[in-house]
Amino acid sequence: MNRRQLLLSLSVVPATVALYVASPAAIALDLGGMLGAAAGDIVKAASLTDQDVRAYASQMAGYMDRKASVAPAGSGYAKRLSVLTSGLSEDQGLRLNYKVYVTKEINAFAMADGTIRLYSGLMDIMTDDEIRYVIGHEMGHVKNGHTKQRMQTALAASATQKAVASSGAKHANLADSVLGDMMVKVVRAQHSQGNEREADDYALQFMGRRRYDRKAAVSALEKLAKLSGGGGSNWLSTHPSPTERAARLKTQIV
């Protein structure tokens, strides 16, 4: 798979564990190179530990940060995020770190090492508690092991198709072409209704623990529904529409 094929494949799905569908512009951050740098030596899927996942996630997050336009510490976006995440460097044993990518795209993603990245386009349209819902949702993806599951699935498929790992070796050097194929599998594997619901449920519980306005979870999804044409019917069939998710969360708020 060449670079053009990879970007075309990714143009219909979000990068990493994104909460919303990203456009090609948001994804075209040299993903092939990112994975090549981050995962030169990847353990077999069967032996992938939590420590392995966190290590690779950290490298990949670092690459993304270098390639993206990160809001500087003194900027309005960074200051707002600092206020919003005050006291949120850790949640239920999960150590977290935050940054804002300056882009018009409406998106957010999390990685297994506790990396959470918000896009400035998302912050522009959401209230403080709506952003906290997004943060809680991304925490949910990490806490529920969705990121680890995606990587294991992708590694298993790549190892099978490309024979990247021998039976006697723990690590295998993966070519960028294999990594590109693996990245497509990673982002496609994440879009299960079960995963999204678990992340939404975690977000609601997180907001309750922190005494944030839980109704903001519903209003955030309703905003996204309007942006996607009233239900996101063009999303992948395995990705619940924001309208459906908002309606489901309403039933849980008393």
Q: Model segments located where?
A:
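A Zn2+-metalloprotease active-site environment signal
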Residues: 2-254
